[in-house]
Amino acid sequence: MKISSFFSKFFIFFFIISLSNTNAEEWTIKSNEDLSFALVSGEITHGDSLAFFMRKSENCEKMWNTFSVYTYEKPKDINQLLSKDIPIKLNGKELTASVQDVRPFLMGYRVLFSLGHFPVKEYTYFLKEFYDEFQLYEIEIIDNKDFKASKYFDIKVNNWKLDNLVTSILEAYDKCNQLLLSKS
């Protein structure tokens, strides 16, 4: 009886911890000798990331916005997606994202998309306003007449929490500027 009570309490505790971690907004901010980045994990597929890169070679003034998608689908022609513009919806608005990389990963593939290259300050302000308006940042890979999303992606939608966007971008920006100061 005592053992089952212990396990019951343990599983309730573990469940509560799991729920709190599920709702956590996990940012990673790092740099190497050439760039810095801020990256947040997805809410639907945790391994999918939304990332913002700043390069020392651009004086840390431009930001490259990317997102990655893991797919279990393994069509033989998945590499033909490289450099193609794929239709997406960002909070319901139809856009395209450019495929930058396709790599085998675990039991499928990880596909890296670019949303573009933007001035850091203006784009950060735009994203904050955009996120505050909708309280959502959701990307869905969609079909068009030349592209069937389900052929390549088993999970076509993900979203990211961006409540800590500004502080995370500022931290990555500071790291990038430290790289500039350490120029030889």
What are these regions (language model features)?
Residues N23-S184:
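A generic "folded-domain core" signal
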Residues M1-E25:
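Classical Sec-dependent N-terminal signal peptides that target proteins to the secretory pathway
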